[in-house]
């Protein structure tokens, strides 16, 4: 029953046609992986003022996957910012994060937010 409801959700709510919903779900999964990779790299780098870069990069990589990746990036970014606002994080920082998220999802170069000295590994 749950898989059936997920399919109906994709058709009705997400507006995905029957020929592309498998592709959409694949892109969403890959986009989620891209977002996780950016988060993991941010934690590993532990570099001052690098969070906007990693936000933009995760969204950029996910959106390159296609509509499913862009959808996953938006859902994950919005949820993350919503949780952080709820826990008392500053509204100005949240707006700046959302700006970086949208920048990356729109296909603009995430290196715009890259801090000086961040190792080339990232």
From Swiss-Prot:
Transmembrane residue ranges: none
Q: What is its main location?
A: secreted
Family annotation (Gene3D superfamilies): Serum amyloid A protein
Q: In which tissues is it expressed?
A: Expressed by the liver; secreted in plasma.
Which PROSITE patterns does UniProt cross-reference here? Answer: SAA
The protein's matches in InterPro entries, at most eight in alphabetical order, are given as: Serum_amyloid_A, Synovial_Prolif_Regulator
Q: Where is this region: Disordered?
A: 100-122
Q: Does the keyword GTP-binding apply?
A: no
Medical condition linked? Reactive, secondary amyloidosis is characterized by the extracellular accumulation in various tissues of the SAA protein. These deposits are highly insoluble and resistant to proteolysis; they disrupt tissue structure and compromise function.
**What job does this protein perform?**
Major acute phase reactant. Apolipoprotein of the HDL complex. In vitro exhibits antimicrobial activity against Escherichia coli, Streptococcus uberis and Pseudomonas aeruginosa.
Kindly provide the name given to this protein in its UniProt entry: Serum amyloid A-3 protein
Q: Which gene codes for it?
A: SAA3
């Amino acid at each position: 029953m749950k898989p059936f409801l997920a399919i109906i959700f994709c058709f009705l709510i997400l507006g995905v046609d029957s020929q592309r919903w498998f592709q959409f779900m694949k892109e969403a999964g890959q986009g989620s992986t891209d977002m996780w990779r950016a988060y993991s790299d941010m934690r590993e780098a532990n570099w001052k003022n690098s969070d906007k870069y990693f936000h933009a990069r995760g969204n950029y990589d996910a959106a390159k996957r296609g509509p499913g990746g862009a959808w996953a990036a938006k859902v994950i970014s919005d949820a993350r910012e919503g949780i952080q606002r709820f826990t008392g994080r500053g509204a100005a920082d949240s707006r700046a994060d959302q700006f970086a998220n949208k920048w990356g999802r729109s296909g603009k170069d995430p290196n715009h937010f890259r801090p000086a000295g961040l190792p080339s590994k990232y």
